């Protein structure tokens, strides 16, 4: 879902919908926790829990009574509570939470697609995500619109890595429309589609593409687990997350 943000509460509502979408797919397919098709969704949900928690905290900080507004700075470790320090802390939490959501969420989507490519033996001419995603979607018979969806989150992530400026491949612009929400990335210009609602909506639409991928006959007939190779390399176990 997408909702123009007028408050931290609106941000939290958009992130909640992303969480619910991930939960729906986890329950729909029922893959084991160490299968990349579940692990990716679980990990997107985990980072979303963090972002929604910060959004709710900032909302309470701005709207709460005097007691709440006194307690939160203490919990955050603010030794000096004035307008400037409160604003700086709030901005820092908001920006870092937003960056974490797109960075970690997009990584999980890209990692999942790489793992599926490896399992199905899908090769691409380049190691880059765009080419790997294109090769997989072509192999599964899915359309170019799905590739545009997956690329939208990647473009947001890349722009935030460049102080919000889009640097297109060979100077190219990129535009997409996700369920009526327009995303425009103009080379050399600051992007205006990297708000929390834009990020949550783009990730949710990418999760929808994962749903299409999981539903493809080639995946439905796959006889075994598709392990998360990144988790294996860094030594993560296959334990399920604890619900907050």
Stretches with model-predicted labels:
Residues 1-103, 144-155, 171-244:
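Extended intrinsically disordered or low-complexity regions, especially N/C-terminal cytosolic tails and loops
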Residues 133-163:
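A contiguous pocket-lining binding segment that forms or flanks enzyme active sites
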Residues 122-140, 168-186:
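Short, charged amphipathic alpha-helical segments flanked by flexible coils
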Residues 76-77, 98-131:
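Short, contiguous, well-structured surface segments enriched in hydrophobic/aromatic residues
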Residues 119-122, 139, 209-212, 216:
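A structural signal for alpha-helix termini and helix-coil/disorder junctions
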Residues 113-121, 158-169:
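Charged/polar positions within long, soluble alpha-helices
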